[in-house]
Amino acid sequence: MALRAQFENSNEIGVFSNLTNSYALVALGGSENFYSVFEAELGDVVPVVHTTIGGTRIIGRLTCGNRKGLLVPSSTTDNELQHLRNSLPDPVKIQRVDERLSALGNIVACNDYVALVHPDIERETEEIIADVLDVEVFRQTVAGNVLTGSYCALSNQGALVHPRTSIQEQDELSSLLQVPLVAGTINRGSDVIGAGLVVNDWCAFAGLDTTATELAVCESIFKLQDAQPSAIISNRDTLVESYT
């Protein structure tokens, strides 16, 4: 299911939220409508956590995570960290990262298996990403842009990238990520995919300006038409068990 939402008249909902297969983070403030869209779709399955990061609401750009972990910048206060620890499921690891490029959501695009990161990220940060999120890390650009998290939206089912990504680069990224990939836009022609879209394995939320065509592309590439959370999780666990 792909839905449209707006945060206080802003269509950049990826700036104010973060969505994974085991939790969703939503910025404090905003209209109740924004929360209700998330909670109606996710409330029975994963916790929807209201929070700030470093006293700001741009939590989607400052954090990155997947179903196994969450990374937050060094500006995160002790109270915020404690609130997240209390609110997220127990198996989810939470780690503060002391990284010069502190907008982690802009410099990391990840799913449960792979992370594409800014080429200049510190070695220690790369190791933390690999360890806490339990992913394979690749230093990469998307259509020549170093902000991989801003210009790419990624789930375990597929990926949507900057519209100017060449066919050759799309093939390269697709083989790295091991998921089908398409170049496109969100919010009526915006190329900043990560800021306008959050997605997991069974639902996606896009800015209110997103056209029907853009939404259809999302539903198709992320395989959201008939996706059910419980079915996906149990299928994936069965697959993982059969390979281990």
Curated annotation (Swiss-Prot):
Classification via SMART domains: eIF6
PTMs per UniProt: Phosphorylation at Ser-174 and Ser-175 promotes nuclear export.
The yes or no answer to whether the keyword Nucleus is present is yes
SUPFAM superfamilies xrefs: Pentein
PTM sites of type Phosphoserine: S174, S175
Example of a GO biological process term = cytosolic ribosome assembly
Q: Which GO terms describe its molecular function?
A: ribosomal large subunit binding; translation initiation factor activity
Family matches, as Pfam families: eIF-6
State whether keyword Oxidoreductase applies. Answer: no
- Cell compartments where the protein resides: Cytoplasm; Nucleus, Nucleolus
| UniProt keyword terms in alphabetical order | Cytoplasm, Initiation factor, Nucleus, Phosphoprotein, Protein biosynthesis, Ribosome biogenesis
Q: Which GO terms describe its cellular component?
A: cytosol; nucleolus; nucleus; preribosome
Self-association state and partner proteins as the record states: Monomer. Associates with the 60S ribosomal subunit.
Q: Which family, according to UniProt?
A: Belongs to the eIF-6 family.
Q: What does this protein do?
A: Binds to the 60S ribosomal subunit and prevents its association with the 40S ribosomal subunit to form the 80S initiation complex in the cytoplasm. Is also involved in ribosome biogenesis. Associates with pre-60S subunits in the nucleus and is involved in its nuclear export.
What protein am I looking at?
A: Eukaryotic translation initiation factor 6
Origin species, per record, is Schizosaccharomyces pombe (strain 972 / ATCC 24843)
